[in-house]
Amino acid sequence: NNLYTIDAVTGAATQVGSGPFAPATNGSSFGFDFNPVIDRIRVVSDANQNLVLNPNDGTSTQVTSLFFGAGDVNFGMDPNIVGSAYTNSYAGAMSTQLYGIDTGLDILVTQANSAGTLMTVGSIGVDLNDTLSFDISGASGFAYATVVSDDFSSSTFWQINLADGSATALGEIGGGALITSMTVVPAPGALAMLGLGGLAGSRRRR
């Protein structure tokens, strides 16, 4: 496993660090986002892995595996977190909250910023699969997700309510694009979405 920076203009990839990071990722579907307060990358997986990556030298640190906290309605259930996003995702943020999407239970959760403790926010109300992406706008605080259909024929763009977890469909993404990773970025007078179709990608700092 290696960490790369991507030039937003040319698309050129540059490896961070001298080699593969360890511990390596474990799982088949992943959530990935920057913690804007400490400038570290959180990576979680459907195998309940919970890693912190250093974007400066490419090293990784294993922290507590994902689990539902005591007293939570889903305590004792096996999580399946495949989308992760932080609030207040902008330079100089003083506080942040990490959210995740569990595609096994079709719910929105919060995750402790230093540990793997999950707490249920609410039902998303959509039968999800693992081919999705999730991000929260640093400018507006609105949360969005893309979900690829089960037959891999289309992707739908959703807005996620962070207060109760409910999802509202904003429409099918045109051209039959299969969006597997996206980030919400501020643009003059509009909200822009950058996406990668057909292959896994990573988010950039906003």
Q: What is the predicted function of each stretch?
A:
Residues N1, I38-S45, Q97-D102, G141-V148:
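Short beta-strand elements that form the blades of beta-propeller/WD-repeat-like
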Residues N1-T5, N48-L53, L105-A112, F152-W158:
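Structural motif
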Residues A85-S133:
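A mid-sequence, solvent-exposed acidic-amphipathic segment
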Residues L178-L194:
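Short, threonine-centered small-residue motifs that mark membrane-proximal processing/anchoring sites
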